[in-house]
Amino acid sequence: DCGACKPAISYLVSEINDNRHREERHGRFINDRVHANIQNDGTFSVVPRIYGGVTSPDELRRIADVADKYEVPMVKITGGQRIDLLGIRKEDLPKVWEDLGMPSGHAYAKAVRTVKTCVGERFCRFGLDDSIATGIDLELAWEGVHTPHKVKAAVNGCPRNCAEASTKDIGLIAVEGGWQIRIGGAAGARVREGDILATVSTKAEAMRLSTVFLQHYRENAEYLERTYLYIERVGLDHVKEAVLDDTSGEPERLLERFRLARAAVVDPWLERNDPVHHNQFSELDREEVPA
């Protein structure tokens, strides 16, 4: 009945079975049971997905309307180029999601969180490639896939690092003639520059190798082990051998496993229409509030 063991077992079983199993939801932490981040007063934060940090007037109007309708105490821009609605009551979560009409941003989950972008060559005079399109394509390809710990990514349109790709779990940086891929960066309690995995000539190859690494991390890291800790534990050379050696067949196997995992992803906010159990979104029980 270990509170830390249940989420770990739940992740491992889902990773092995590509979510094709019946899960015991009580094994999840409260955030993962209701798909929102619990706050210190027992309310929740809601972060819809904003692909590549790019929104629209229509999305902004809907977010503003939701903030007014549910008297949201704070609307905050996040460091990941998203919008956080703070102070939502548990019983209001399904209605908020319905009114937003946007998919979950998985800000509460051990999963791919965001793919941060700069404006790239579309607007920036220093841009070498289309960082916005690349970031959106990556986020669409990876969204909702669970990982041993949270994964943050970014795409820079040039080496000036405006999207901070050099300190993300996975960072793509446009350089003269191609893309540099960095892995294992961090900018939290510890700051670490990501290691160079490879430099490739095309966006397609950069996305492919990044996805191969992501699946390698999913299969081999310990639960709650961030990418930089995993790389430091096993060594960058070990990771490169697994991810870059096409003759071994391992990269293609990893890609296929990732495709299966991504195909099994369902937006968790759709549970608003079909709750897993009758009190999933009922008023918060005091026992649910973490100490």
Predicted regions and their residues:
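Intrinsically disordered, low-complexity polar/charged tails and linkers
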Residues: 26-41
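Mobile "lid/hinge" segments at catalytic clefts and subdomain interfaces of large enzymes
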Residues: 152, 157, 161, 166-226, ...
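Compact, charge-rich alpha-helical regulatory domains located at protein termini
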Residues: 1-10
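Conserved active-site/ligand-binding neighborhood in enzyme cores
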Residues: 34, 38, 49-55, 65-66, ...
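Small-residue-enriched alpha-helical segments and adjacent helix-cap loops
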Residues: 23, 44-180, 275-291
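Generic secondary-structure signature for well-ordered alpha-helical cores
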Residues: 14, 18, 65-72, 101-105, ...
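Flexible, glycine/charged-enriched surface loops at secondary-structure junctions
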Residues: 19-25, 72-79, 147-151, 219-233, ...
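Charge-rich, low-complexity terminal tails
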Residues: 252-291
